[in-house]
């Protein structure tokens, strides 16, 4: 029985009990007190208990409806009228009890500047909160990257609910929006220490190398934060705190969350939907050197862009070699073939979680021909709905993140930060289906099919068989000692925070 049916059932039960008590027992009690003033006390108690129990049942039903939701999907037995009614009820504000503050001797202040796109910064924030907690320092709300390719001026408070971030983690670490005035003045005068921590470090590095610097300088600024904490070899409580920050401490702003709910509601009204993280934007192709399917003019444009950014060290890139090694995102044409081979219903809604696709409609034609119900946030919402986050790529990515979490199927066409962080979050939400495409395997198979070396039936059955174990089901991370870039990423499979089979880590 779904929650709405329980609610209606308990409500009828409550009304029936109230009616019986109001019209029958109350009247009898009244007469009884007149005619028999020495009525047995147990009868009064019995009636009182019955009345209280009826009220309790009713309140329990309401409690199920009004309990906090973490952007959950609606029960399948809701109709549209019940859906809108329940949505109104769950929008009522609830008072949340804050955890008690953790009391500790403060060793200093940690400032961090995150680098990269939204999800690279998201993982870095989780790491830096964890590091701050185990060094017993005060963390200043992280600064987000404003100088990278995306040139997004968004502050932390423009993307994340900063008050929730501070209060929800206060039983672990003290977080401030800014330094105390005296120390802030010192920083403005340049009297502080700044450095990038070493990548893939364990907790002993932070205890033995970083903490002494915090104590010495009082304020330490870590100016790079990507992958600065190891995937493996950390205490379980450290890993669980990383999860807690990711899944509970980091909430998007109410404005972004509300827009995400609206997009999901629009999609759900038309049935199931698949979110496709089609990472085929200009920056990805330029910096990766992947130009398969592009015309000569486009290849030249991508090369010019790569050379225009001096911080990008790799300039000369063999596109076809990278593609065959599985290091390029799938093209829209390759994606259409792959989804069809996997047996995805051509009528399913496909939500594109990405920026502007390079090559526009010309490159998207194969995908939209194969799957006519391709949509984007720009086509589902009014233009004015997106005004607040227009030209703010991280806020747009936050909206896509929310929709990706709620999708029936999530399919990324590369293994970048969004693909991996969303995959891990979907595992946490109950191992929701995420198809992890093996690009190296697929491009070889696609080339054989397009060259006429494979029939469609063989191509399709091979793709299905290979990916049958790559659907986001429970598994252990692959550990490769001293090669952290090649092993499974912690945030893609935070197994310490999940219900898994009792299996050891896979080590090669």
From Swiss-Prot:
| BP terms from Gene Ontology | fucose metabolic process; pectin biosynthetic process; rhamnogalacturonan I metabolic process; seed coat development
Enzyme class of the recorded protein, top EC level: transferase
Coarse class of the protein's main subcellular location: Golgi
Keywords, A to Z, come to:
Carbohydrate metabolism, Cell wall biogenesis/degradation, Fucose metabolism, Glycoprotein, Glycosyltransferase, Golgi apparatus, Membrane, Signal-anchor, Transferase, Transmembrane, Transmembrane helix
Q: Name one Pfam family in it.
A: O-FucT
Keyword check for Iron-sulfur, yes or no: no
Q: Which residues are glycosylated?
A: 136, 202, 223, 391
For binding substrate, which residues are annotated in this chain's numbering? 277-279
**Which GO molecular function entries does the Swiss-Prot or TrEMBL record give?**
UDP-glycosyltransferase activity
InterPro entries named among the record's database cross-references: FucosylTrfase_pln (IPR024709), GDP-Fuc_O-FucTrfase (IPR019378)
Which sequence ranges are marked TM in the entry? 41-63
Q: What is its EC number?
A: 2.4.1.351
Describe what happens without this gene: Reduced volume of the seed coat mucilage due to reduced levels of rhamnogalacturonan I (RG-I) in the seed coat mucilage.
Activity-pH behavior: Optimum pH is 7.0.
Q: How does it sit in the membrane?
A: Single-pass type II membrane protein
Would I find Cell membrane among this entry's keywords?
no
- Cellular localisation: Golgi apparatus membrane
Gene Ontology terms, cellular component aspect?
Answer: Golgi membrane
Q: In which tissues is it expressed?
A: Highly expressed in siliques. Expressed in stems and flowers. Expressed at low levels in roots and rosette leaves.
State the reactions this protein catalyses.
alpha-D-galacturonosyl-[(1->2)-alpha-L-rhamnosyl-(1->4)-alpha-D-galacturonosyl](n) + UDP-beta-L-rhamnose = [(1->2)-alpha-L-rhamnosyl-(1->4)-alpha-D-galacturonosyl](n+1) + UDP + H(+)
**What is the protein's known function?**
Glycosyltransferase involved in the formation of rhamnogalacturonan I (RG-I) oligosaccharides in the seed coat mucilage, which is a specialized cell wall with abundant RG-I. Transfers the rhamnose residue from UDP-beta-L-rhamnose to RG-I oligosaccharides. Prefers RG-I oligosaccharides with a degree of polymerization of 5 or larger than 5. Does not act on oligosaccharides with a degree of polymerization of 4 or smaller than 4. Does not require metal ions for its activity.
Recorded family membership? Belongs to the glycosyltransferase GT106 family.
The protein in question is named: Rhamnogalacturonan I rhamnosyltransferase 1
Q: What organism is recorded for this protein?
A: Arabidopsis thaliana (Mouse-ear cress)
Q: What is the lineage of its organism?
A: Eukaryota, Viridiplantae, Streptophyta, Embryophyta, Tracheophyta
């Amino acid at each position: 029985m779904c929650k709405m049916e329980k609610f209606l059932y308990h409500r009828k039960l409550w009304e029936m009990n109230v009616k019986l008590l109001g019209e029958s027992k109350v009247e009898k009690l009244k007469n009884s007190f007149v005619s028999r003033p020495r009525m047995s006390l147990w009868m009064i108690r019995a009636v009182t208990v019955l009345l209280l129990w009826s009220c309790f049942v009713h309140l329990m039903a309401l409690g199920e409806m009004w309990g906090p939701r973490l952007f959950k999907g609606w029960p399948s037995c809701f109709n549209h009228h019940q859906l809108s009614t329940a949505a109104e009820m769950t929008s009522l504000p609830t008072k949340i009890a804050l955890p008690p503050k953790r009391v500790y001797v403060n060793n200093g202040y940690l400032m961090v500047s995150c680098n990269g796109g939204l999800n690279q910064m998201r993982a870095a924030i989780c790491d830096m909160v964890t590091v701050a907690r185990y060094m017993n320092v005060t963390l200043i709300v992280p600064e987000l990257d404003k100088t990278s390719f995306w040139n997004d001026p968004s502050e932390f408070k423009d993307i994340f609910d900063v008050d929730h971030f501070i209060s929800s983690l206060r039983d672990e670490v003290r977080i401030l929006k800014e330094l105390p005035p005296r120390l802030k003045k010192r920083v403005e005068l340049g009297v502080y220490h700044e450095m990038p921590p070493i990548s893939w470090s364990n907790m002993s590095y932070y205890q033995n190398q970083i903490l002494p610097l915090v104590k010495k300088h009082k304020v330490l600024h870590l100016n790079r934060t990507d992958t600065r904490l190891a995937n493996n070899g950390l205490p379980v409580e450290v890993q669980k705190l990383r999860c807690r920050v990711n899944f509970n401490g980091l909430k998007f702003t109410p404005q972004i969350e509300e827009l995400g709910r609206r997009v999901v509601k629009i999609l759900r009204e038309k049935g199931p939907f698949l979110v496709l993280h089609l990472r085929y934007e200009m920056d990805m192709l330029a910096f990766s050197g992947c130009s398969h399917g592009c015309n000569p003019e486009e290849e030249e444009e991508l090369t010019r862009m790569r050379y225009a950014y001096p911080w990008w060290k790799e300039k000369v890139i063999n596109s076809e070699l990278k593609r065959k090694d599985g290091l390029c995102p799938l093209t829209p044409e390759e994606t259409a073939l792959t989804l069809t081979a996997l047996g995805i219903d051509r009528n399913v809604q496909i939500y594109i979680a990405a920026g502007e696709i390079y090559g526009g409609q010309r490159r998207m034609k194969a995908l939209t021909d194969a799957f006519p119900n391709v949509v984007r946030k720009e086509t589902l919402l009014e233009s004015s709905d997106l005004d607040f986050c227009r030209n703010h790529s991280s806020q747009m990515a936050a909206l896509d993140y929310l929709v990706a979490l709620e999708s029936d199927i999530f399919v990324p066409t590369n293994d970048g930060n969004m693909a991996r962080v969303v995959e891990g979050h979907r595992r946490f939400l109950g191992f929701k289906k995420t198809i992890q495409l093996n690009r190296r395997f697929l491009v070889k198979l696609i080339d054989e099919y397009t060259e006429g070396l494979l029939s469609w039936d063989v191509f399709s059955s091979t793709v299905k068989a290979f990916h049958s174990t790559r659907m986001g089901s429970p598994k252990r991370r692959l550990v490769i000692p001293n090669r952290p870039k090649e092993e499974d990423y912690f945030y893609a499979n935070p197994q310490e925070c999940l219900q898994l089979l009792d299996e050891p880590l896979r080590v090669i």
